Curated annotation (Swiss-Prot):
Coiled coil: none annotated. Belongs to the UPF0502 family. It comes from Koribacter versatilis (strain Ellin345). This is UPF0502 protein Acid345_3645. InterPro entries: DUF480 (IPR007432), WH-like_DNA-bd_sf (IPR036388), WH_DNA-bd_sf (IPR036390).
Amino acid sequence: MTLILNPESARVLGCLIEKEITTPEYYPLSLNALINACNQKSNRDPAMSLDEDSVRVALRNLTDKGLARHAPSEGRVPKYEHDVNNAMQLSRREVAILCELLLRGPQTPGELRGRAERMYKFEGIEDVHSTLQRLMERDPALVVVLPRQPGTKEARYTHTLMPVDMQPQPAVEVSHSVSGGNDGRIAQLEAEVRELRAEIETLKEQVKSLTPVN
């Protein structure tokens, strides 16, 4: 059975995994809650605007592949949950990494460590590297390392559930005629800005999860 997903199915799967971990009191998700999760602005790249039909189709796709299902519910409103644990037999740290890759696309180990912290507290960057390595060593692999882009120090990793050319790509940086020292300083500042943005998005999501729903 192929597990290749389209962008909509990848987003739905990532949201189901994320909400189970970060807001378990509201999980499994109703269709409306899942649509809102798919379209939220924080912790998503790219931003999407999925409608009800798109999410229903994505759920059917995931259900056919054994990755999602209707959740048992005593209420009238149907709810949905992922089935990644049974389908893939992943550890908690592996689930956190896969979820972030589904929600944001290719990322560096440093970005993954900061962004996945709301789902799993990694002991350090080495812990992230070892988790990525385990995901790459699976058969078939769930993660691959991408060729390093010009001007970047860290390699990026991505999941294999969706073709790489369908995943979000970082903007290409234009090289200017500046000294080598300035180049290094600019790259350092840009990396710091990226990390700060990731921390801000994480804090936003944590505050949002603490806000009671009326």
